[in-house]
């Protein structure tokens, strides 16, 4: 039986419309501590030690689906929901998600004053080290107290990592289809695994505290995990 051209066109339009509407994925970045969601400013615990993270800023770079980079760099402010949700184009299924933790070496040479204020690398984000002429990768500030209570005689915490040698990457082999929702989870307890909250609470990636920055950076790949919903 013959089908007329007029009867075929509506079907073709329907399938075309459905396909175009799904040529993307959404990416959500979540914070957890030992697998439990938390918010910046909430008191957390490692054993008897109380921890309060008061600022969590970081960069992710070269976010790729399969072999194609979809975002060259994003700035994440854990107190700004908009900076933790992204839409990435994807027209066909891929089997890998990859990204860098920090700013890649090419972007790390950029001048922050050359960008508009809404750009991830803008000086407005206060992530640039003028003394080192490069970006901080992770900027995490807070307080710890071995007594188990934040508020009196707290010890300051400042984990500021940067420099090209501290850039880390991660690849996850996972099936991703257009229309999927991706959740990238950052477990901050994994970040400080093996790091002393008594003696290793300060690093600006300088010579005298560089070993702490290396520890934190080496923990980053294990601290991030991806799931597809």
Which residues are covered by each model-predicted region?
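A short, solvent-exposed, low-complexity linear motif enriched for acidic/polar residues
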Residues: 19-229
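C-terminal motif of bacterial Sec signal peptides marking the signal peptidase cleavage site
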Residues: 14-17
């Amino acid at each position: 039986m013959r089908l007329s051209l007029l009867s075929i066109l509506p079907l073709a339009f329907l399938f075309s419309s459905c396909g175009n509407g799904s040529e993307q994925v959404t990416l959500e970045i979540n914070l957890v501590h030992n697998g439990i969601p938390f918010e910046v400013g909430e008191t957390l615990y490692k054993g008897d030690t109380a921890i309060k993270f008061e600022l969590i800023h970081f960069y992710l770079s070269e976010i790729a689906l399969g072999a194609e980079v979809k975002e060259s760099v994003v700035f994440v402010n854990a107190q700004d929901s908009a900076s933790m949700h992204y839409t990435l184009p994807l027209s066909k299924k891929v089997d890998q998600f990859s990204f860098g933790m920090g700013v890649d070496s090419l972007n790390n040479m950029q001048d922050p004053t050359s960008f508009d204020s809404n750009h991830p690398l803008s000086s407005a984000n206060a992530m640039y080290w003028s003394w080192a002429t490069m970006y901080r990768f992770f900027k995490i500030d807070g307080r710890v107290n071995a007594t188990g209570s934040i508020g009196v005689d707290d010890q300051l915490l400042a984990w500021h990592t940067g420099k090209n040698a501290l850039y880390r990457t991660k690849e996850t082999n996972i099936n991703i289809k257009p229309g999927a929702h991706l959740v990238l989870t950052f477990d901050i307890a994994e970040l400080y695994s093996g790091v002393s909250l008594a003696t290793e609470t300060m690093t600006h990636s300088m010579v005298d505290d560089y070993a702490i920055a290396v520890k934190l950076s080496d923990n980053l790949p294990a601290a991030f995990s991806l799931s597809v919903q």
